[in-house]
């Protein structure tokens, strides 16, 4: 069985790691290169580095930071934020990223997913979905773009199916309702999408306890769990999470 993954998320704004609640109220959480190194050494399986202001401020991701971070860490590394062209993807992969995450640009031009997958390989193309529960229609989640500021009107489950059909290798699924709250992942949303596509789904938004992480895997059927506040604030360590999940008989890579 393929090992389930724990992935610290580094949301970066103006060169610093930040963390907020429900996509707002950002506070400083440290230097991305230092934090990336720390999590790499602590036993994380991968890292995700998202330049959360890149799309909104119409600037490209800080390639230099990617280069410095990739030189410092020994685990696979995904980079997202403001990537809107094949050249942008190429630049980040050349700078040392293992994968790139597309979000607003994929909604605007879905062919970027298939073009990226054809040129660089599906394994390099992650598509991020920022989803929020529709208040009026049950079992429906809306897709948001531009750092959670704009409702596209797209249905998250239908969009996930299209992403899969276009050749993406992975989906990074963030519950905007859960983001930063530490009230648990949106298990229903995660399960619905995990069951609809046969590529890995990374659960994101809401981890606050060991059982939340276990639930993302067992009930949500995700392949990976994204972690931010929980780790940045020092509430739990990667080691503590892995030891717990191994005791719960989940297929986790032990820390050597």
Swiss-Prot record:
Pfam families: His_biosynth. Keywords: Amino-acid biosynthesis, Cytoplasm, Histidine biosynthesis, Lyase. One of its GO terms (biological process) is L-histidine biosynthetic process. Its EC number is 4.3.2.10. Coiled coil: none annotated. HAMAP family: HisF. Belongs to the HisA/HisF family. Heterodimer of HisH and HisF. This is Imidazole glycerol phosphate synthase subunit HisF. It comes from Prochlorococcus marinus (strain NATL1A). The gene is hisF.
């Amino acid at each position: 069985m393929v090992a389930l993954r724990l992935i610290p998320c580094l949301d970066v704004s103006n060169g610093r790691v930040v963390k907020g609640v429900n996509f707002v109220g950002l506070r400083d959480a440290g230097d991305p290169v230092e934090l990336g190194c720390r999590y790499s050494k602590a036993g994380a399986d991968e890292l995700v580095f998202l330049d959360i202001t890149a799309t909104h401020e119409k600037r490209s991701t800080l390639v230099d930071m990617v280069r410095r971070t990739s030189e410092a860490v020994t685990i696979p590394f995904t980079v997202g934020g403001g990537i809107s062209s094949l050249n942008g993807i190429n630049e980040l992969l050349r700078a040392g990223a293992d994968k790139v995450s597309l979000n607003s640009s994929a909604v605007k031009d879905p062919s970027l997913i298939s073009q990226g997958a054809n040129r660089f390989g599906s394994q390099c193309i992650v598509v991020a979905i920022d989803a929020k529960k529709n208040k009026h229609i049950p079992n429906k989640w809306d897709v948001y773009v531009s750092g959670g500021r704009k409702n596209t009107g797209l249905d998250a489950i239908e969009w996930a199916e299209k992403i899969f059909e276009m050749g993406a290798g992975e989906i990074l699924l963030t519950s905007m309702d859960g983001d930063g709250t530490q009230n648990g992942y949106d298990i229903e949303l995660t399960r619905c999408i995990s069951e609809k596509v046969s590529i890995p789904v990374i659960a994101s938004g809401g981890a606050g306890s060991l059982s939340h992480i276990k639930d993302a895997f067992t009930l949500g059927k995700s392949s990976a769990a994204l972690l931010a506040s929980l780790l940045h604030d020092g509430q739990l360590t990667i080691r503590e999470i892995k030891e717990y999940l191994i005791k719960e008989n989940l297929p986790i890579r032990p820390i050597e």
